[in-house]
């Protein structure tokens, strides 16, 4: 079995049960590994047999990724796709099980995650105007992450039907095609409603994407949102700014405010507590440093009926 054919079969196999987002991830990142094999062995992928892939080649690929200067977390993200592909090849009998022997992911980065402060969020908000389509759209995107804990992919896939303005909640199809419900706070509700009414010909029952490229009906992509953040990082002067930091800030602020860990797990869409518990540490760290972490709307912490 040659590498190109194995790659094609791998994608067909995973398309039967993986989300579209996961397939895009595998297609891009496994292709990087396939290109590496082609460069190292001096042949096209359809001329390379899977059984020539060695443990040494796999370690060389990991070494090349480390040489890019990316953080360990990013390197592990790229390398994970190659490992999944190789495990598929091993299970199908295309290559030896020895190729992944003692090949481990890199240790997690030790750099602390510092949630955004109230002052920093004010700086971010000040970079946009609610009076323009672009500004209002971007504010909605930012506060979906900051006030609802959305991932970047959640923002892109949110539809008209996923917003319930009457009952104040959002429904999103997240990782693994799992649906979850998140509370819609007043500030975010107002911004979303104005954006949809003014710029998106909003009808509650339709399944159209909420966000579009400015002046068009073309849906935004994850790449276009990343470009917004790249510009925002320069303009705001917040060097550590990236989309997932806003989700971290939401979760940390929820814990600091006295939020329930089980509620947080459900809102973030985590399958277990292992990842969610990280925010207990971040919350304690922020308290210890007397950090003025961005505060969520008080409605998140109302008690009683």
List PLM regions with ranges.
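Conserved catalytic core of the tyrosine transesterase superfamily
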Residues: 1-305
